[in-house]
Amino acid sequence: ANWKLVLENNRECYHCNASHPELLKTLLEWDDVTDPRADQAFKDHVAASAAAWDAEKIPYAHASFGLRNRIVRMPLLKGTVSMTLDGKQGCAKLMGRIKNPDLGSMRILHLPHSWNHCMGDHIIVFTVWPISAQETVVTTKWLVHKDAVEGVDYDVERMRKVWDATNDQDRRLAE
């Protein structure tokens, strides 16, 4: 698809509610309490999550580095801990020193080409690169704990379902 359409589709989220049912089983549609769509329930959920993260000394404050780089941690939907179809852990081994799987999604954005979701159990890395005016390569990688064993600690297909569906939906929208 046209690279400008691919990038625009991936940076605006107004299409998500109508286009990404799998993704919105766990991911909140926005990542800012000042978003005009943010209702009081969302703001309360963010505040409760921030209090829990403070207790565990988990950083979450928005940080911007120029216009293209941003880091923010946002909660997932209540009752979910990972971007899987059922919202449960996709990998039994948690990342790094993490002991609590309910850490939301730490988003690391290097716009316009890369955005990442870091959860307690795995990390999703996206890159988008234009090849020509009408062709774009979108790459998605899933990272798990270095000691996690496929088939024992995680199921690749189960962990990929949400973003495989979302990427395919976005491809159809942009083409």
Q: What is each residue range found by the language model?
A:
Residues 1-175:
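C-terminal catalytic domain of Rieske-type non-heme iron oxygenases
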